[in-house]
Amino acid sequence: MGDDDTPVCLSVASCKGVSCWLDKLLLWALTLSITLRNTAVDCRRVDRNGLLSPNLNSSMSVVRMGQNVSLSCSSKNTSIDITYSLFLGKRYLESKRRRGGAVDFHLRISNANESGPYKCKVNDSNSSKYSQNFNFTIIQDESCSSCLLSLLLPGVLLGLILPGLAFLIYLKYKKGCTGKTLKENESKGSGDAPTQGELYANICETQKGSEQLQEIHYTTPVFKEVAPTEQEGLEDRKDDYIYSELTY
């Protein structure tokens, strides 16, 4: 009977050994899990108490020269007062302070050097963090010819309009002068006899030996028709005459 009990005792002993080994392994795994959990909690606690890196972005990344832009620097730390500072490369631009959230910086792109890189810095009394770099893309005007045309067009139109106006004024003035001359000629003339004023010069010579200069007098004769008169002794002659009265 003893021979029959020996294998049973050995199997029970081996089962106890395996069970102890499994218990030790389970205990070690449980300890490791608790340790890792505590480490994670400590890391989270450090992140909550420390600063997080801010985020810098803009509503537009492609701009033109001379355009106004805005950069937004945001932080997830909302429980403490934070100072936000903006940098262009290593050059300091501006600072704002508030309790977490986001702040906006307004800029004007005046030259190609102001395209970037921009960087935002957040800091409190204990630490500071920087954001990623941000760059703008500056595009040139599509065509300079259109700008040139818009500048030259007013000058070209002005150059065309002014000569046209001058020509119209000249024609109007010439027409007015011609009409006035015709009216004067019609008022001077009468009947079918063409009478036009001519310029005559009367030269009066001084007496010999006098030192006075010669004077030239100009006058315009006016011709008028008068009725013919009958002369005595010439009744038989039927010649027609036209008489004019000369007035100075």
Swiss-Prot record:
UniProt keyword annotations, A-Z:
Cell membrane, Disulfide bond, Glycoprotein, Immunoglobulin domain, Membrane, Phosphoprotein, Signal, Transmembrane, Transmembrane helix
Tell me the InterPro entries matching this sequence.
Ig-like_dom, Ig-like_dom_sf, Ig-like_fold, Ig_sub
Cysteines engaged in disulfide bonds, as pairs: C73-C120
Tell me where the transmembrane regions lie: 151-171
Position of sequence motif ITIM motif: 216-221, 241-246
Query: Among its keywords, does the record have tRNA processing?
Result: no
* Residue ranges occupied by any Ig-like C2-type domain in the UniProt entry: 54-137
A GO BP term here is: negative regulation of mast cell activation
Biological role? Immunoglobulin-like receptor which plays an inhibitory role in degranulation of mast cells. Negatively regulates IgE-mediated mast cell activation and suppresses the type I immediate hypersensitivity reaction.
Q: How does it assemble?
A: Monomer. Interacts (tyrosine-phosphorylated) with PTPN6, PTPN11 and INPP5D.
Designated name of the protein: Allergin-1
Source organism per UniProt: Rattus norvegicus (Rat)
Lineage, uppermost ranks = Eukaryota, Metazoa, Chordata, Craniata, Vertebrata
Which gene underlies this protein? Milr1
